[in-house]
From Swiss-Prot:
Transmembrane segments: none annotated. Gene3D superfamilies: Umud Fragment, subunit A, Winged helix-like DNA-binding domain superfamily/Winged helix DNA-binding domain. This is LexA repressor. It catalyses: Hydrolysis of Ala-|-Gly bond in repressor LexA. The active site is at 131 (for autocatalytic cleavage activity), 169 (for autocatalytic cleavage activity). The lineage of its organism: Bacteria, Bacillati, Bacillota, Clostridia, Peptostreptococcales. HAMAP family: LexA. It comes from Clostridioides difficile (strain 630). The record marks 96-97 as: Cleavage. Represses a number of genes involved in the response to DNA damage (SOS response), including recA and lexA. In the presence of single-stranded DNA, RecA interacts with LexA causing an autocatalytic cleavage which disrupts the DNA-binding part of LexA, leading to derepression of the SOS regulon and eventually DNA repair. Coiled coil: none annotated.
Length: 211
């Protein structure tokens, strides 16, 4: 529906809308960087300038976080009253042989704008550790996961190792081996036999609570 926008620009616009509906105010540029997987704030500023030029947003250069979503984007508005909100389960633990969404595993339900959620079988997982910091996924962040049991090379997955520990890593299949690659320059990849790894789902989004 955003025919004049790139994929990144759509992600940025939808993220801004979602933060306004969830928090009541727009995100900082650094938060946008993290949310859409960009490392450079100048790249985000470039996308924001394009969104403003096309009439999707209005910025106030004299104020931080001063981004207003304009009427043009409200064809797909997540801040409007008609926007569908869905509740995704926050899963406290993942255990082999037990359904992920078993009631005893669910800590709470978190509301999300439906337009930001890919797939139809999603859950939220709290990240522990710093193995994915280069991908913008930090300790105590929350990831949105599309429940699947297969993955393509380079996708970020939630995987169960030897039926015991769940981990978030980038997935690569190399012959009969699986490489679970951290996004941290100080950590080594995990190499496992195919039979030792169970794909739980694909990470499709990340968000954090600013304390």
């Amino acid at each position: 529906m955003y025919l004049d926008l790139t994929e990144k620009q759509v992600l940025i616009l939808e993220f801004i809308k979602s933060q306004i509906i969830l928090k009541g105010y727009p995100p900082a540029v650094r938060e946008i960087c993290t949310a859409v997987g960009l490392r450079s704030t100048s790249t985000v500023h470039s996308h924001l300038n394009k969104l403003e030029k096309l009439g999707y947003i209005r910025k106030d250069p004299t104020k931080p976080r001063a981004i207003e979503v304009l009427e043009r984007s409200k064809v797909n508005d997540v801040s409007g009253a008609n926007q569908e909100i869905i509740e995704l389960p926050l899963v406290g633990q993942i255990t082999a042989g037990e359904p992920i969404l078993a009631q005893q595993n669910i800590e709470e339900y978190i509301p999300f704008p439906a337009s930001l959620v890919k797939g139809s079988n999603n859950f939220v997982l709290r990240v522990k550790g710093e193995s994915m910091i280069n991908a913008g996924i930090l300790d105590e962040d929350y990831v949105v996961v599309d429940k699947k049991n297969t993955a393509l090379n380079s996708q970020i997955v939630v995987a169960l190792i030897n039926g015991e520990s769940a981990t978030v890593k980038r997935f690569f299949k190399e012959g009969n081996l699986i490489r679970l690659q951290p996004e941290n320059d100080f950590m080594e990849p995990i190499m496992l036999n195919d039979s030792e790894v169970e794909i739980v789902g694909i990470v499709t989004g990340v968000f954090r609570v600013i304390k």
